[in-house]
Design a protein with these regions (language model features):
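Signature of N6-adenine DNA methyltransferases within the class I
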Residues: 1-206, 230, 240, 244-247, ...
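Short Ser/Thr-interspersed hydrophobic loop/turn segments at strand-loop and sheet-helix junctions
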Residues: 219, 257-275, 302-316
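Acidic/histidine-rich catalytic neighborhood
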Residues: 85-93, 333-335, 349, 353-356, ...
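Short beta-turn/strand-loop junction motif enriched in small, turn-promoting residues
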Residues: 78-81, 224, 271
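Contiguous C-terminal substrate-recognition/catalytic subdomains in enzyme active sites
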Residues: 205-257, 265
């Protein structure tokens, strides 16, 4: 239960007593468990896995690494309990040691097993055979090598070492979320719902918006698609729309100076697969169509890297959740990219092919005729 659901009195009480763990009731119990354990004692809990990775629990992870240890963990993931189906509830069973030690904890990665019975059998097999492929040994203090200190027990020493020598993606491209309208039903539409003459496709700067057009292309994320596409939405962003949105409690006009700039974009919700696309200038972006803004020289190389399995592997270390937010992506390590000219040519080809595919069907505002004709 998140802190926002605790109620005013209880929320304040928990925040005062569990300053590193108050964001969720289950993490407050983790902290309380240390207080109830004897020195060198243990506490064991089944909790949501969110504390292992999310930025809001970074202080709790830091406290565990500084003052305590993880003796063992069965990382259950989703579908750990037959009575709770679906992909939403992700859990972990952890034995915490109330002492700082250098003993490597035992970790059982059961997240890829799809039922309670499979996870039970997998745990028993790992106990009998440490070479099974889902058993790991790791010292909790080693997680501090990764930005945000996620409990990425499966990370190799080589992978963790990259973070110390590489430049972060955030330094090169400044990823960020965009505008929250406060009322998408009124202010974000599909482009075919509006008169095409009332949509501006060529605006390059907020201050130079035309006064005679109300709608502008808007990157709003969308389904899995690499390189180019998901260009379906427009946002009302003329002066009258902005003035109306300002009256809405949910309106958040963030990063206005980046609107209409060329960007790399992706969807906040990924279903486990990341896909990154090139957006030329002329587009707005909202809070779920997150975007990054590298310079022209590094644009294609960074887009190429983001669409690789290597980037996906590092993203799973940083945030193995259904969300791919700007803060997590900013932590991706970027090493020097060799063969830049070849990469640029290949990326241009990928964008060209995917654009041709997107424009071949009626969802594209650039559609002219079906490719079979």
């Amino acid at each position: 239960m998140g802190s926002s659901s605790l109620g005013k009195w209880m929320g304040a009480w928990v925040k005062k007593r569990y300053t590193e763990a108050y964001r969720d009731l289950c993490t407050s119990f983790i902290d309380r468990g240390f207080g109830m354990s004897a020195n060198n004692g243990y506490s064991a809990m089944v909790t949501m896995q969110s504390w292992m990775f999310l930025g809001s629990f970074e202080k709790l992870r830091g406290k565990i690494m500084r003052n305590h240890s993880i003796s063992s963990m069965a990382h259950l993931g989703t579908r750990a309990f037959g009575a709770i189906g679906g992909e939403v509830v992700s859990t972990t069973a952890t034995v915490f040691a109330n002492a700082k030690n250098e003993v490597k904890g035992a970790y059982f990665r059961l997240v890829d097993m799809v039922s309670e019975e499979e996870k039970q059998a997998g745990l028993l097999e790992a106990l009998a055979n440490h070479e099974c492929g889902w058993f790991y040994r790791a010292n909790a203090s080693g997680f501090e090598a990764i930005p945000g200190s996620p409990i990425a027990y499966w990370a190799s020493n080589a992978a963790m070492g990259v973070f110390s020598s590489a430049v972060s993606f955030g330094e090169l491209a400044n990823p960020s979320a965009g505008i929250t309208t406060g009322d998408n039903a009124s202010y974000i539409h599909y482009w075919w719902e509006e008169e095409i003459s009332n949509i501006s496709f060529t605006t390059n700067d907020f201050s130079s918006r035309p006064t005679d057009q109300k709608w502008f292309p808007c990157n709003k994320g969308g389904a899995f698609r690499k390189w180019y596409g998901n260009r379906e939405n427009v946002m009302a962003f003329d002066d009258s729309a902005i003035n109306a949105m300002r009256k809405l409690p949910g309106y958040r006009p963030v990063n206005i100076e980046k609107q209409f700039k060329a960007s790399i974009s992706w969807s906040d919700i990924t279903s486990g697969r990341n896909s990154f696309r090139a957006n030329g200038s002329g587009n707005l972006y909202d809070h779920v169509g997150i975007s990054a803004f590298p310079d022209e020289e590094s644009f294609n190389c960074l887009l190429a890297f983001l669409n690789t399995s290597v980037a996906s592997t590092f993203m799973i270390l940083l945030a193995p959740t259904l969300h791919c937010n700007a803060g997590d992506l900013a932590k991706l390590p970027i090493v020097e990219i060799k063969e830049k000219n070849s990469v640029n040519e290949l990326v241009n080809d990928c964008i060209k092919l995917c654009r041709r595919d997107w424009d071949a069907f009626e969802l594209s505002w650039a559609f002219r005729y079906h490719p079979m004709i």
